[in-house]
């Protein structure tokens, strides 16, 4: 199982967030991690430092030499595919062939102020968009309307460093999305938030079946799972250090974690005490069974379970609110875990 780093920027000072990104990227490059993933986020302080993963990936590319630099994810329906093809070809050139993209359909109506006509057809645009990106990177031309309605034939430049830039499809839990990734010969980027173990197993089976049905070989079978991560010397230290930032994150994203407010079971608003109790219980369950929060030894069973399901890479989200220096310090323990899991 390979280990990469994943960023999403929950509630931290932007300057500190960029420092964490760049210092962690240098560490990942030196220690043999697989990739550094940065997201695309818009119009909200949650994820605010990351409006364009091609920019952050270009920054990471210029200070590293081995680690892959990837988007987690590009929300393709928000953009002109010509620009996406151009930007990521530049990243692939700057990195000497280390670029990769996970492609997402998008879900937040607020984001679609960038492309309001695409919201209702966002799913179909992912399929079409992936096919067009591959065509552009291979040197094919596409037709686009120009001034006065005149149709023009255009190629994008530069070409990527490699013949093919690896692609993933981002899937939150929809079986349809897992199957689409297989049909297109893409990897899968997913998570365990609101997705049960049984559902993940079924979805991965659908993915493998679709991949095989489309005629792709085992080399295309790439399954990456994002996990909130903080590995300390002992489990108790890790659990307590991560508790406040994780519960704050869970409070702001309850539906993502499959949680219901206490007020949904009765009348009137939930009391602070009831909400704290709910979040504390949910944190304990998620931290122990769906996150790499603990010691090296306590995190091993989760990695083994994921490996048994066919997961070959973990994208370790380290910037969920833990102080930057604490997150950086914990990377040494994560590197030990990575070494222990190399042969899984």
Ranges and model annotations:
Residues 3-7, 36-38, 69-72, 99-103, ...:
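Hydrophobic faces of well-ordered beta-strands that scaffold small-molecule active sites
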Residues 1-63, 67-68, 163-165, 333:
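N-terminal beta1-alpha1-beta2 module of alpha/beta enzyme domains
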Residues 35-56, 60, 75, 107, ...:
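Glycine-rich, proline-tolerant flexible connector loops at the mouths of alpha/beta enzymes
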Residues 120-157, 198-311, 339, 343-344:
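An alpha-helical appendage that flanks or caps ligand/catalytic pockets
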Residues 6-18, 74-82, 162-173, 229-232, ...:
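Active-site mouth loops of central-metabolism enzymes
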Residues 15-27, 87, 171-179, 296-305:
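Short, acidic/polar
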Residues 80-186, 198-214, 218:
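Internal, glycine-rich beta/alpha segment that forms the wall or movable "lid"
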Residues 28, 32, 40, 60, ...:
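Conserved, mostly hydrophobic/aromatic
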């Amino acid at each position: 199982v390979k280990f990469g780093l994943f960023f999403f920027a929950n509630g931290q000072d932007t300057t500190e967030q960029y420092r964490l990104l760049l210092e962690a990227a240098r560490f990942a490059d030196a220690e043999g991690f697989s990739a550094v993933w940065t997201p695309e986020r818009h119009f909200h302080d949650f994820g605010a430092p990351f409006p364009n993963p091609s920019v952050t990936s270009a920054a990471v590319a210029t200070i590293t030499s081995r680690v892959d630099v990837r988007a987690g994810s590009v929300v393709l329906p928000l953009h002109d595919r010509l620009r996406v093809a151009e930007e990521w070809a530049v990243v692939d050139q700057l990195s000497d062939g280390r670029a990769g993209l996970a492609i997402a359909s998008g879900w937040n109506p607020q984001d679609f102020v960038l492309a309001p006509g695409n919201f209702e057809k966002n799913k179909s645009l992912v399929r079409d968009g992936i096919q067009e990106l591959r065509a552009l990177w291979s040197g094919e031309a596409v037709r686009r309307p120009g001034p006065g309605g005149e149709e023009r034939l255009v190629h994008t430049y530069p070409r990527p460093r490699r013949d093919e830039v690896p692609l993933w499809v981002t899937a939150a839990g929809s079986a349809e999305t897992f199957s689409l990734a297989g049909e297109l010969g893409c990897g899968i980027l997913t998570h365990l938030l609101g997705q049960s173990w049984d559902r993940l197993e079924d979805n991965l089976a659908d993915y493998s079946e679709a991949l095989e049905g489309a005629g792709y070989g085992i080399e295309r079978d790439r399954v990456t799972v994002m996990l909130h991560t903080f590995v300390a010397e002992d489990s108790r230290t890790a659990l307590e250090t991560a508790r406040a930032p994780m519960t704050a994150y869970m409070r702001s994203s309850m539906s993502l974690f499959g949680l219901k407010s206490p007020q949904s079971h009765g009348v009137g608003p939930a009391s602070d005490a009831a909400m704290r109790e709910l979040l504390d219980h949910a944190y304990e369950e998620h931290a122990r069974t769906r996150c790499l929060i603990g010691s090296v030894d306590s995190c091993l069973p989760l990695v083994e379970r994921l490996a048994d399901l066919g997961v070959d890479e973990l994208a370790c989200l380290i910037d969920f609110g833990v102080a930057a220096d604490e997150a950086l310090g914990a990377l040494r323990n994560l590197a030990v875990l990575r070494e222990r899991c190399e042969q899984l």
